[in-house]
Amino acid sequence: MAGQMVHVEIPAGDTAKAREFWGSLFGWQFEEYPGSPTEYHMTRFSETQGGAIMGADGDKRGPRVYFDVDDINTENARVGELGGSSGEAYPVPGMGWFAVCKDSEGNEFGLWQTDPNAPGA
């Protein structure tokens, strides 16, 4: 459903400690996602919603929320038209496409398009 929050990434300097915290707080169970350029541990909240603890990228702190879209290229273009910064769309093999963008105030967020035919790397 377009506009629904579908994923959240929580950066951490110590991913084991963060997984222990969030796992204990909410009962989340994590699986390492292979092939990621950074340490990345995924969890599921529901059939269509999930999240991840990921290695921190420099001084960046705070979660990044991803929103579902019907067409990532169309919505990515709209981000720019509305005064934000659009990002390149990348495939997640067999799952879909994502793009990291910034809103008009510089806040990062992500777009997600489900596509089981998304190509491999």
Question: Where in the sequence are the language-model features?
Answer:
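N-terminal beta-strand motif that seeds the catalytic metal site of vicinal oxygen chelate
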Residues: 1-19, 63-65, 115-121
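Vicinal oxygen chelate
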Residues: 5-13, 31, 57-121
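Catalytic core of tubulin tyrosine ligase-like
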Residues: 22
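Amphipathic alpha-helical "stalk" segments
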Residues: 6, 16, 37-48, 74, ...
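Conserved short beta-strand elements that form part of the metal-binding/catalytic scaffold
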Residues: 28-62, 108-114
